[in-house]
Amino acid sequence: LTRVQATPGSVQGYLDPSAHWHDLGTVAEYQQVKAEIEKPVRGAIATVDAAKLFGYALTAGEAPIKGGSGRRFHRVAKPDGSTAMLCIYDDARPENLGYGRIGHALFAAGINVPQVLAEDTDAGVLVLEDLGDTDLCTLSQQPTFPWPAVASALEQLGHLHRLGAEAVQTAGVPLMEPFGDKLYTWERQYFTDNVLAGRKLDRDLQNEMATLAKELSGRPQVLVHRDFQSQNILVRQDQAWLIDFQGARLGCQFYDYASLVFDPYLTCKDMDLWRIEIEDHAREVADWKGSLDEFSHLLHIAATQRLLQACGAYAFLGRKQGRADFLAHLPQGLRNLTIAASLCGKRRIARMAEELAGATAVSR
C-alpha cells in the first residue's frame, strides 16, 4: 500500500482467466498442497536409491529378476551379507499398493509367504524376504515330477482359503472387488477381445460361457489367490511359498485349485495322470464333504473359466505388448481349455478351443 501511495500505478495485477479461484487461506492448507506437489512419483525412484532407503545395495553382477504388472525386482544385500528381494512398483495396477499389507496379514496368520521386511508406499518400494529363485514351474521340467512341492503348495492354498479372509479382515486390509458376475463377465470378454480379436460369438456359445459364472457364483467365498500357477509358487526344501498374491480377493476356492491343475506352464510328461493326483489331493485339502463327481465337475467348470482369462492374457501380452514369451503358452492354454470344457460338458467351448489351438499351432 505504501508503494502504491508513493508511485501510483507501480504495482501491477494479474487477471486469472480460469473458471474459479481457490484461496489456500491457511498455512496448513498451503503446506498440504505443497506436500502433494512434492510427493514422489510412485515407482520412479532409481533402483540404487531404492535399495539405499533401507540400508541395502544391489547384488554385484546380478541381472534384474523378471517382473511385470508395473513392478521390477532386484536381489539386494546388506553389508553383513544378508540378502532380500527389492520390489519397486508403480500405479499401473491398483493392487500393487496392497501387496505389502496383504503379505503382513498372511505371514502373521502362519501362511507360507515372504516376510515383508520394509516398505515405503509413497516411493513404491517394498523389501521382501529372499526365498531364492526356484519355482514350481522350473522344478516341473526336471525328469522327476516334484510331487512333494506340489502337495505342499496345495496345503498352503488350503491354509489361505481357511485363514486368509479373517486374517486380512482383522488387519483392516482392503481387497480388490470380489469375484462375481461382473468379474467373470470381464474375464470372458478379455478372451473374446484378445484371442478372438473381438469376433462376435454366436448366442449359444455366449450362453454356454455365461453358465460358468452361474455355477461358480453359487459357491461359498473364501480368500483366493487368483493367480495360483506354478511360476507364483517358490520352493525351498520341498516346501511351497506363495508369491504374487496382490490380486487376492473373495471368490470360489475351485478357481485356485483349477489354476494349478490346468496350469499351461506345467507341460511335463504324463501331465494328464498328474492332474488326477493333484485333483485328489486338492479334494483332501479342501476337506470336501460332497461327492467326488461334484468336486470334479466344479473343478472343471472353474478351470474353463480360469483358462478363458489366462488365454486372454497370453494373447494380450503377446500380440499387443510384444511379449513372445507369453504368446508361446497360448496353444497349450487352448489345449487345456479344450480338455477342461469337455470334462464339464461345455461342448461348444471345447470345440471352439480345439479349433483355435489347431489354428494357433499352424500359425506358429
PLM regions with names:
Residues L1-P8:
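A short, conserved alpha-helix in the catalytic core of glycosyltransferases
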Residues Q12-D16, H20-V125, V222, R236-W241, ...:
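Conserved NTP-binding catalytic cores of kinases and kinase-like/nucleotidyltransferase enzymes
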Residues I65, H74-W186, Y190, L196-A197, ...:
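ATP-binding pocket architecture of kinase catalytic cores
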Residues G70-A77, L86, L160, A210-Y257:
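Active-site acidic catalytic loop and adjacent metal/ATP-binding pocket
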Residues Y99, P146-A153, Y184, D202-M209, ...:
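Hydrophobic packing residues in well-ordered alpha-helices of helical domains and bundles
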Residues M176-F179, S291-A302:
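All-alpha amphipathic helical-bundle segments outside canonical DNA-binding/catalytic cores
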Residues Q189-G198, Q253-K289, A303-Q321, G333-A340:
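Active-site activation/catalytic loop segments of kinase-like enzymes and analogous catalytic loops
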Residues G312-R364:
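ATP/Mg2+ or Mg2+-diphosphate-binding catalytic cores
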